[in-house]
């Protein structure tokens, strides 16, 4: 099981969900974790940072390549603490939470991908 990327409560789940702002149904490819502003975002496993910048709709984003086609994505950050090409270790602080996405509250949007396919992070994260 993987460690959690941030302490907080899951407020939006993987799969088909009603969007709180647009009142439509969307297929969520990750989860939203409500956290205190400025909470440290931690890499869930070792890897190489392949993206760390603004992405429309996601705000400040960090994407880590964990090899063998496995990626993690961390969005809505208020601050990025890493850069493209940097090798990170499990548990390393890579950013701080914020509200730079479209949700309008302080959350971390967290996604796991196996190849091009999103997978439910809650199936991979340690139970708590």
Where are these regions (language model features)?
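Extracytoplasmic/periplasmic cell wall- or extracellular glycan-interacting regions that localize
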Residues: 1-51, 56, 119, 125-128
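Conserved positions in beta-strands of structured domains
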Residues: 11, 48-50, 78, 95-98
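Feature marks short, surface-exposed loop/turn motifs that line or immediately flank catalytic pockets
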Residues: 18, 70, 116
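Short, acidic/hydrophobic/Gly-rich beta-strand patch recurrent on exposed beta strands
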Residues: 22-25, 31-34, 61-66, 109-111
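A generic structural motif
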Residues: 28, 36-38, 69, 77, ...
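Surface-exposed strand-loop junctions at beta-sheet edges and helix termini
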Residues: 35, 44, 82-83, 88-89
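Zn2+-dependent peptidoglycan hydrolase active-site motif and core
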Residues: 43-78
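Conserved, short, structured surface segments that act as functional micro-motifs
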Residues: 62-63, 84-128
């Amino acid at each position: 099981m993987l460690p959690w990327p941030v302490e907080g409560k899951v407020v939006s789940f993987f799969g088909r969900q009603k969007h709180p702002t647009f009142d439509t149904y969307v297929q969520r490819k990750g989860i939203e974790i409500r956290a205190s502003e400025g909470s440290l975002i931690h890499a869930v496993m070792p890897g190489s940072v392949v993206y760390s910048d603004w992405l429309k709709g996601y705000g400040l984003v960090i994407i880590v390549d964990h090899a063998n086609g496995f990626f993690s994505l961390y969005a809505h950050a208020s601050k990025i603490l890493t850069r493209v090409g940097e090798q990170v270790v499990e548990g390393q602080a890579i950013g701080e939470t914020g509200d730079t996405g479209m949700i309008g509250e302080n959350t971390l949007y967290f996604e796991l991908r196996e190849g091009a396919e999103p997978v439910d992070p809650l199936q991979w994260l340690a139970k708590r």
